[in-house]
Amino acid sequence: MSNPLLHIEGLPPFSQIKPEHIQPAIQELIEENRQVIEQVLKQPHFTWENFIEPLSEAGEHLSRAWSPISHLNSVKNSPELRDAYQACLPLLSEYSTWVGQHRGLYNAYLALKNSPEFATYSVAQKKAIENALRDFELSGIGLSEEKQKRYGEIVARLSELSAQFSNNVLDATMGWEKVIEDESQLAGLPESALLAAKQSAESKGLKGYRFTLEIPSYLPIMTYCENAALREEMYHAYATRASDQGPNAGKWDNTAIIEEIMTLRVELAKLLGFNTYTERSLATKMAENPQQVLDFLNNLADRSKAQGEKELAELKAYCEKEFGVTELAPWDISFYSEKQKQHLYAINDEELRPYFPEDRVISGLFELIKRIFNIRAVERFGVDTWHKDVRFFDLIDETDEVRGSFYLDLYARENKRGGAWMDDCIGRKRNADGSIQKPVAYLTCNFNAPIGDKPALFTHDEVTTLFHEFGHGIHHMLTKVDVPDVAGINGVPWDAVELPSQFMENWCWEKEALDFISGHFETHEPLPEEKLNQLLKAKNYQAAMFVLRQLEFGLFDFTLHHTFEAGKANQVLDTLKAVKDKVAVIKGVEWARTPHSSSHIFAGGYAAGYYSYLWAEVLSADAFSRFEEEGIFNPVTGKSFLDEILTRGGSEEPMVLFKRFRGREPQLDALLRHKGIAN
C-alpha cells in the first residue's frame, strides 16, 4: 500500500490520509533526514549548494507530511487520529534534539559562517545561518553529554504535556452541554443564537435548544440571556474547564500538567545558562530583556488603570439606576455591558450581522488587498480538502504571477479546535532547478455556519478576526524570501509576528472600507450611515478594561515564567491573584481556573510571550498611522508596507524593517489614540 504522506508533490491529498499512514510516514521521513545529514557531513568542505540545500530538501519532505497531519489533528480530531498524532510527538522531539545537539552539523554551520563565501551570501542566507547557530546554542550544543541527554528528555516530555493540555481543554469544552426545552428560560437571546442552538439539538436527536462551551454558543448566553442563573451556570462551567473545580472537576484536570510544564521550563532555562524561563524566551524575540517587557506592561497598566476604573464605575452606576443592581458578578459584566452599550450607542452586534454576510465580507477583504497591495484573490475549485465547507484561493500579483494560496475554513464544527488561526501548509523556497515553490496557508476560524437558506452572517468582531488571520496569511504568502528558514513567518520574532495581523484589523474601523466590506444580505445596502457612526463611536467602549484584560494575561504569563520556583505550592493561582490585584478592575471568583484552559501559554507558542500581542500592537498602530497620514488606500504606502515588511519575512530584524517603513522607531501614542486611552 502506498503512503500518501511520503514525498507529497503539490497540495496535501487530504481525502487519502488515514490515521494508519501517519506514524510509518513520519518514521521513514525522519530516517531519511538522518541519512541525508550523515551523508552531507562526509564532504571535505561545505557550501550553500552542497550542504544547506540538500538538508533543506529533506526537511521539506518531513514538514510537507507533518503539516497536514498536525492540521487534521486540529480541524478533524478523532480518537484514531489523535493517537497517531501523539505517537509521532516523541519521535519528532527526539529527532529535533538530535539535530540541535549534532556537533558535526554545528561545526559545518560554523565553517560556513567563517568561510570567505559567507560575505557573498544574501541577507536572507546570512540570517538563516546565524539563526541556525543561535538555535544550536539554545538546544544545548555546548552542554556536557549528560546535560544534553537531560535536555532531550525535558523537550520530549514538554511536547507530550502540551499535547495532553490541549486534549484536556478540547475534551472539557466538548464534555459539557446544556439542553433547554422551555424557550422562556432563554429570554433576550437573539434569533441567530436560538436557531443555532435548535440546529445543534436536532443534530443530536434532541428536543429544544442545545448549548455548549464553544464560543459561538457560549458568548450569546453571556451577552444577551436575561436568565442570570443560566449565565452563572455556563460561566462556572466555562471558567473551570480542565481543572479541579466546576461540574466536571478533576475529570480533565490540567493542574498537575501546568505544574510539571512550569517546573520543566525552569529546569530547561537553567540548563542552558539562563536565570529564568523569560530570559530563554526572549533569546529569540525582539524585546531585549525581561525588565524591558515588565516595564512595558506595567507602564501600559499605569496608563490604563484609572480609565478602566472609571469605565467600571460608569457601568455600575448605570446598572443601579436602570436595573437596581448594586453588585456585579463576573457573569453579569458582558450582559450589562451590552445593555449599557445599546443605551449609549443604540447598537448591538446582532443588529449588524445582516450587514456582514460571508460573501460580502470576503469580497470586501479581497477588494482591500487589491487597492492597497495590488493583489487579486481568485477562488480555485476542485481542490482536495478535509471538509466540504472548505474553500481554496490563489493570490495573484500585477504581473499575473501566483504569489501564494490558502485554504479557508470558516465554521465551527465538532472535533475542531476552538479559536482562529493561520498556519503554514507549504513554505516558499527556491527549488534545485531554480523554480520557486509557492507558499500555501491554512486560515481557520470558528464562526456560525449558514442556517437554513440564510448565508453565514458575521458579527463585526468576527469580521475583525478574519482580517487579523488574513494579515498572518499575507505575511506567509506574499514573502519574496527564497530561503525557507526565514521566508514568510519563519524566523520572525514572536513579538513581531502579530504586526501584519493586527495591522489588517484597522480597516474594519474605517468608513470608506466598511462601505465595501458590508452589505445587507437581502438588499445589498452597505451599513447605513447612522449605524456606522454608532459602531465607530462604540469602538472604544470599555477600551481600557479590554487593555487591562490583555495586560492581565500578559503579566500573569510573564510574571509566572519570571518567578516560578519548582516545588513551591500554589504559585500559579497566587501569581494570578497578585496580577489581578494590580491590574484588574473586575474582581475574580475563588473557583475560576482560567490558566487551566490557557492553551496559548501552556500548549502554544506564547510561553513568556503573551505580551507579544500588545507589543506588536504598538508596531501595528504606528504603522497604520502612516496610512492615516497618507491615505488609507494609498497604493504607494501599501507598496512600501508590502516591500519593507510583508515580503521580507524573517530575513532581517523587525526593528530595522519597521524603521525602514516608518522612518523612525515605533511610538506608543498611536496605540493609545486608537484605543481611546487618554495619553
Each model region followed by its residue ranges:
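Short, hydrophobic/amphipathic alpha-helical patches that form generic packing surfaces
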Residues: 60-71, 134, 236, 333-341, ...
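Membrane-interfacial loop-to-helix junctions in multi-pass inner-membrane proteins
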Residues: 50, 85-89, 253, 296-300, ...
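Active-site-proximal, well-structured secondary-structure segments within enzyme catalytic domains
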Residues: 124, 128-130, 157-160, 167, ...
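Short pre-active-site segment immediately N-terminal to the catalytic Zn-binding motif
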Residues: 448-467
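His/Asp/Glu-rich acidic catalytic environments and adjacent acidic regulatory segments
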Residues: 1-33, 74-77, 81-288, 303, ...
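C-terminal, non-catalytic "cap/extension" segments appended to globular domains
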Residues: 1-21, 28, 46, 188, ...
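C-terminal non-catalytic alpha-helical accessory regions
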Residues: 30-120, 550-560, 564-581, 585-588, ...
